[in-house]
Regions:
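Histidine-dependent nucleotide/RNA phosphoesterase domain, centered on the 2H-phosphoesterase fold
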Residues: 1-172
Length: 172
């Protein structure tokens, strides 16, 4: 089972970015499916089904003291031909949450992939983008059915709850 842990921006945030990109295009460009737009927190790779309870427990424990986190999509970049929107906001809290997760704690650029094909207009639109702020309030464990056509299934989701020992008050 191919797994990753992600934050999913709310529908209105994804729609705003999609509109911004579509408005910038003079010709159609293939974007990734908007309903699957997410910010990967940790890629867990292939895991035997019998390890799912242990993985779920670890992700749930991370969520229990990891948020909520105020974020926004802003700016952009690319990894090869893949184009992405950047993530801005409370990045210290974002990285604290990421550090609580199993695996995936090497070098990392928070991002949301919008296309796997480089396109100058989309790249320019991403660089100029500053989306609305939103609160990440849920951490999701996702099964990627990569071999069966790039579908995603939500395995489990946990509310991001503040760490009671942290002393910070989450902003809504």
């Amino acid at each position: 089972m191919r797994l990753f842990v992600a934050l999913f921006p709310p529908e209105d945030v994804r729609d705003e970015l999609r509109r911004h990109l579509r408005d910038a295009m003079t010709r159609p460009v293939r974007l990734t499916a908007v309903e699957r737009w997410h910010i990967t927190m940790a890629f867990l790779g292939e895991n035997p089904d019998e390890e799912l309870p242990e993985i779920s427990q670890a992700v749930g424990a991370a969520a229990a003291g990891g948020g909520p986190i105020r974020l926004r999509l802003a700016g952009g970049g690319n990894f090869g031909t893949a184009l992405w929107a950047g993530v801005d906001g409370d990045l210290p809290a974002f990285f604290r949450l990421r550090a609580r997760l199993p695996l995936g704690n090497g070098p990392f650029t928070p991002h949301l992939t919008v296309s796997y094909r480089d396109h100058a207009e989309v790249r320019a639109a991403l660089n100029a983008y500053a989306g609305p702020p939103w609160t990440a309030s849920e951490l999701v464990l996702v099964h990627s059915r990569h071999a069966e056509g790039l579908g995603y299934d939500r395995v489990s989701a946990w509310p991001l709850q503040p760490d009671p020992c942290d002393g910070r008050v989450a902003q809504a």
